[in-house]
Amino acid sequence: MNWSFYTLILGFCIDLLLGDPHGFPHPVVLIGKLIDALGRLFRALLPKTKSGEIAAGALLWVFTAAVSTAIPALLLIFAQKISVWLRLALESIMCWQILATKSLRDESMKVYAALQTGSLSDAQRAVSMIVGRDTERLDEKGVARAAVETVAENTSDGVIAPLLFLAIGGAPLGFFYKAVNTMDSMLGYTEPPYKNIGLVPAKMDDFFNFLPARLSAFFLLAAGFFLRLDVKNGWRIFRRDRYKHASPNSAQTESVCAGLLGLRLAGDAWYHGVLHKKEFIGDAVREIEYADIPHTCRLMELAAILALIVCCAVKACFIF
């Protein structure tokens, strides 16, 4: 029996209910430690040259992806030998830990709550937990914009893309995706010391997110339709601005959200003390408001539910 059909649904529901409880062990933390250890190892073994660092990044990517896929696969095989119900429970827990729907909402709503109280420093601190830019330079609108942007972008990376990988290959493929995404998050920067070692992880992340990012954009458009937002403008901005980002994937969902909400997102941002020039995404039909954070969360959640329905419908065609 194809248990991944049921574990996908169970894992999704558990994620909506529990999110990431504080203090609960998370496999992504272990993946991060593996990346850090392998990075130090391969950098020590290979020449301190551009080609040596690129090779270190390539080896790191292969080993991390392989280990992150093999361990959950072996655990599920052993669980199956003991009991199919143990396999069902274990894979459901794995699926839950791969998805990030509730945690993305919870963390972004902390930013919203801080803005509502009028504490800019608290809002900057809260948004620094979910974005990579230098948040101490942001004013209230900049903080709100950063929160909206990260929810929009992570609708693909944190929710729909892992959901698609889970639907195709169960928890092992889901963890493969999380490893790919985590390597890019930790190493995929254009500044030293990550520029060379992060090249392969960044390119592989672009490759594996190419289709999920575009599918996520369409799920967001569908969610916008059900929420009675400006889908026509969402489609227009998507077609116009979806490549206005250094990554070929990041602006796919961001452009849809900008169009649906009538906002202008992106623009110049500081990272690690360096100003990065970026194009704007969307048109400033209106000024951004604090309430746009929960609005974007609702878009993300409905898009995730629609993606789950489609994934389950497709899987059902092959199972039943």
Task: Locate predicted features.
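Glycine-rich phosphate/dinucleotide-binding loop and adjoining beta-alpha-beta core of small-molecule
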Residues: 185
